[in-house]
Amino acid sequence: MDCFKVFEVVFQSEINPLLLIPAVATIALTLCCYCYHGYQWIRDRRTARIEEQQAQLPLPLSRISITPGCSMVATTKLTHSRNSVDIY
């Protein structure tokens, strides 16, 4: 249906067009709230997924370990190195 035909029907009817403003505003506000709710839901799911992945992966650990009886200080890197990005 053509847009102009809709306007013609509205203006020819006995309905006051000013009465349609609250209904249109309510529908627009409902649509905005629905879109914002979807945006929040997607953002929360993304945050939860990132937190879940961080909880599953061990933290990159680089520490100095001193072996008893040995004067040498060894650096130990457990699990991750700079090249471990290729694994994921």
UniProtKB/Swiss-Prot annotation:
Pfam families for this protein: Hemotin
Keyword Ribosomal protein: no
Gene Ontology cellular component list: early endosome membrane
Principal location class: membrane
Membrane topology designation: Single-pass membrane protein
Membrane-spanning parts: 15-37
Tissue specificity field: Expressed in hemocytes.
Subcellular compartments: Early endosome membrane
GO biological process, one term: positive regulation of endosome organization
UniProt topological domain (Cytoplasmic) ranges: 38-88
Disruption phenotype: Mutants reach adulthood and show no overt morphological defects but their hemocytes display a more vacuolated morphology than controls with enlarged endolysosomes which accumulate undigested phagocytic material due to impaired digestion. This leads to decreased resistance to bacterial infection and severely reduced lifespan.
UniProt keyword list: Endosome, Membrane, Phagocytosis, Transmembrane, Transmembrane helix
Stretches of the chain found on the membrane's Lumenal side: 1-14
InterPro entries in the record: Hemotin
Job description of the protein: Negatively regulates early endosome maturation by binding to and repressing the activity of 14-3-3zeta which prevents the 14-3-3zeta-mediated activation of phosphoinositide 3-kinase Pi3K68D. This, in turn, inhibits the Pi3K68D-mediated conversion of phosphatidylinositol to phosphatidylinositol-3-phosphate and prevents progression of early endosomes through the maturation process which regulates subsequent steps of phagocytic processing.
Record text on subunit structure and interactions: Interacts with 14-3-3zeta.
Name of the protein this chain belongs to: Hemotin
Gene source species: Drosophila melanogaster (Fruit fly)
This protein's encoding gene: hemo
